[in-house]
A protein has these predicted regions:
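Acyl-thioester-dependent acyl-group transfer interface
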Residues: 1-68, 75-102, 233-420
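Short, well-ordered alpha-helical segments in soluble proteins
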Residues: 131, 135-139, 231, 292, ...
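Tryptophan-centered motif/residue detector
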Residues: 70-71, 101, 135, 165
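Non-catalytic, low-complexity flexible loops and terminal extensions
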Residues: 1-14, 32, 109, 118-126, ...
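Acyl activation and transfer enzymes in specialized metabolism, enriched
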Residues: 36-52, 113-129, 198-236, 385-388, ...
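Alpha-helical scaffolds flanking conserved acidic
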Residues: 110, 219-220, 241-244
């Protein structure tokens, strides 16, 4: 008898992604790991097969139900391949049973692309770290002979597929959320649909930390302030009437214990009004730090998480057919888009076993977007800032030039013509 496939409800954060996936914004993000040697595809395929034993949830397809989308396990097995498409190309096709992730390689880089319905950055990063771990372990088996090397990945497959939003949801009276008016939108000519510009800057972690401390700020606070100020420099006086709003995804695992590799994040909004406040970087940074202190607390995040989950648990909403929900979710996404200027995501420090560090140069990530977004991560002393953009313009140049003017040495790589 044919085994009935397992299925999972989408987590709360994932529910908005299927209805809003399109060619311009594929809802795909990419993590990459650059080694000091050329990638061997034979060992990479073996490493992927071993990794999937730890992450069976990844072998899934997205399907439509009567009331909600859902994830269903599949026997389809992924094959690694040389990179042959633009970054963050579509992975989800409504009429096709396609896997929601892809592994490719190019010279010294291993790429993992994931549709956001499957996982968030923290979950996908654990997958890539595991993949790189097995690749190095098998490729250099002689070097690790008689050595016990572990990656802190002891959770079960069941724990990895847990819906942490449902686990922590508490029904409560939700207070009124801060009203944010429509935000300023970055201007520029669009690249062709399916294309995306990527500009990456690699900086010394030590030097960036030192610069942030000089401004009495965390790295994230400092980068958000410089990004806001760089956006301001491209605004007209009339456009300054609208606020600059930066969305910051927050990893809820840092506040609510969870081993899930599915989505478990909450977005906070950092708002600055140049029409009403001073126009210098230090004032912007002061405002950014204050907002982080106010919004980045367990209580505030819990309230926001419950407010989002409440809609999912609403009886009336549950009974609305999926076709109607799609229209509702598209409208909600449009409102969200109107109220944000850009996004900055910092996934933090990437850790690997000490014995494997000599084989790895850096990790990086970037996200599909209809506008311009920043994503950052660090490995050892390499801090990589990746700017993904659907728009032609000099905003990335202004941002990196500000950092360079402050004394940071930056190694720039890009797939578009952009110089600093």
């Amino acid at each position: 008898m044919k085994k009935k496939p397992q299925w999972h409800k989408l987590d709360n954060a994932a529910k908005i992604f299927p209805a809003n996936t399109d060619k311009r914004d594929t809802k795909v993000f990419r993590f990459s790991c650059e080694l000091y040697e050329q990638i061997d595809p034979v060992f990479l395929q073996k490493a992927l097969e071993k990794t999937l034993q730890k992450f069976p949830y990844y072998c899934s397809i997205l399907k439509r139900g009567l009331f909600w989308y859902y994830i269903e396990n599949t026997e389809r097995k992924p094959l690694i391949h040389i990179e042959n498409r633009y970054p963050c190309s579509p992975l989800y096709f409504p009429n096709r049973k396609s896997l929601l992730f892809d592994v490719s390689y190019y010279h010294k880089r291993i790429n993992l692309e994931v549709h956001h319905v499957l996982s968030d950055g923290s979950g996908a990063l654990l997958f890539l770290r595991t993949l790189v771990y097995y690749y190095i372990l098998h490729k250099h088996s002689e070097a690790f002979l008689n050595k016990e090397i572990y990656l802190e990945n002891t959770t079960t497959a069941s724990e990895k597929s847990t819906d942490s939003f449902s686990k922590y949801f508490q029904k409560e009276h939700t207070s009124k959320q801060q009203k944010i008016p429509f935000a300023y939108h970055i201007k520029g000519e669009y690249f062709e649909i399916g294309q995306m510009g990527v500009i990456e800057g690699c900086i010394s972690v030590k030097m960036l930390l030192q610069l942030s401390k000089q401004h009495q700020a965390t790295v994230t606070e400092f980068l958000v302030a410089v990004w806001i100020y760089s956006i301001y420099e491209g605004m007209s006086v009339k456009e300054q009437k609208k606020p600059v709003v930066i969305s910051i995804p927050v990893n809820l695992r840092n506040y609510f214990p969870s081993d899930s590799t599915r989505n478990f994040f909450k977005v906070i909004q950092i708002v600055y009004r140049f029409g009403e406040q001073k126009e210098d970087l230090e004032t912007v940074l002061c405002s950014v730090k204050k907002q982080f202190q106010q919004k980045l607390t367990k209580e505030q995040l819990r309230k926001g998480m419950n407010a989002l989950s409440a809609l999912e648990h609403n009886i009336t909403m549950k009974l609305v057919p999926l076709a109607t929900k799609d229209y509702i979710l598209r409208f909600a996404n449009w409102i969200s888009y109107q109220k944000a200027t850009s996004c900055l995501s910092n996934v933090g420090k990437v850790k690997m076993p000490q014995e494997m560090i000599p084989y790895i140069r850096l990790f990086d990530l970037f996200v599909s977007t209809k506008t311009t977004q920043i994503a950052t991560c660090s490995f050892e002393d390499n801090f990589v800032i990746s700017i993904a953009t659907a728009l032609k313009g000099d905003l990335p140049k202004r941002f990196f030039c500000h950092l360079s003017d402050m004394g940071l040495e930056i190694e720039i790589t890009t797939n578009i013509e952009q110089e600093c």
